[in-house]
Amino acid sequence: SDTKNTINWTQFSLQSNSPDKKGIKYSQDAVGKAKGKGAEEWECSFVYPLFDAPIINSFINHFKLHRTRLMIQEPRSVLTYHKDWSQRIHLPIDTNEDCMMLLGNMQAYHLEQGKIYYTDTTKRHTAFNCHNFIRRLHIVGCLPLNTRTWE
């Protein structure tokens, strides 16, 4: 089958780039905008909570996250091998033993459900969901650009 146009993941923004919440609300609406000149500043502008969700918002505030998203990866899928502008915090909400991340050192990691993980996504990485029917669901937030190590 032809998989070139298959969407392997969906993301929903948990933060807006506008205090009145009228800016871009879903990162998916802005695919391609986080590239090139000004991309870092654009990505860092997503700091305003979109939902009255005290537990999620306290998680965001604790780590000083921006552009935090709920990310869903489909079964039997792999993301492109890429690198990002900033380091990330991952909180796996629903995962399975057939999900893993391949990080810059080419080592595969299984991120366990309910644990918090620092990932240096400024280095090349990808994610796999090899399960036949279970999706992978993570909350992923970008750390401040001046973050150098896990604090």
Label each residue range with its predicted role.
Residues 1-58:
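Non-heme Fe(II)/2-oxoglutarate
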Residues 92-113:
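A short beta-strand-loop-beta hairpin characteristic of the jelly-roll/cupin
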Residues 79-81, 99-101, 119-132:
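Short beta-strand His + acidic residue motifs that chelate non-heme Fe in jelly-roll/DSBH
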Residues 72-73, 83-99:
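Short, conserved beta-strand element in jelly-roll/cupin
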Residues 89-92, 116-118, 132-150:
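A short hydrophobic beta-strand segment most commonly corresponding to one strand
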Residues 38, 106-111, 117, 147-150:
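Catalytic phosphate/metal-binding cores of nucleic-acid and nucleotide-processing enzymes, i.e., regions
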Residues 74-76, 114, 122:
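Tight coil/turn sites that cap or link beta-strands
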Residues 55-75:
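A short glycine-rich, His/Asp/Glu-containing loop-to-beta-strand
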